[in-house]
Regions:
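C-terminal capping alpha-helices of c-type cytochrome domains
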Residues: 76, 88-107
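The canonical Cys-X-X-Cys-His
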Residues: 36, 40-50, 98, 102
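N-terminal export/targeting leaders of redox proteins
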Residues: 1-30, 107
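Conserved beta-strand positions that form and line the central face of beta-propeller blades
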Residues: 61-62, 82-85
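Gly/Gly-Pro-rich "capping" loops immediately C-terminal to redox-active cysteine motifs
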Residues: 27, 31-37, 49-77
């Protein structure tokens, strides 16, 4: 009897998930611009600031940066001077999505 109730409950909970979000695992969810902005807040703003001008611990002022997209990607990936590498903590796709966020901080 308990097994029947469990089975019915399991089937009903599976059927109630009709959207793709219920089926698709979170790691397969596309990385969005909003996610990139949040990633900047979490990984970058503590040194660069929300406006790119903080300069904590020698962080460069991103509002005056002239780096190309490739240079920004390389800096995020490998780090530079006191900035650590993020190669092990975020994906290349996420790094590429950070480029427009970083460039949006320019004057």
């Amino acid at each position: 009897m308990v097994l029947k109730i469990f089975t019915v409950g399991l089937v009903l909970s599976c059927l109630s998930c009709s959207s793709d979000a219920c089926i698709e695992p979170l790691e397969n969810k596309p990385f969005t611009e909003s996610d990139a902005a949040n990633l900047y807040t979490v990984k970058c703003s503590s040194c660069h600031g929300s406006d790119g001008k903080l300069g904590l611990s020698g962080a460069k002022d991103l509002s005056i940066s002239k780096l190309s997209d490739d240079q920004i990607l390389q800096t995020i990936k490998m780090g530079k001077n006191v900035m650590p590498s993020f190669e092990e903590s975020i994906s290349v796709e996420q790094m590429k999505m950070l480029i427009p966020v970083v460039k949006s901080l320019r004057k």
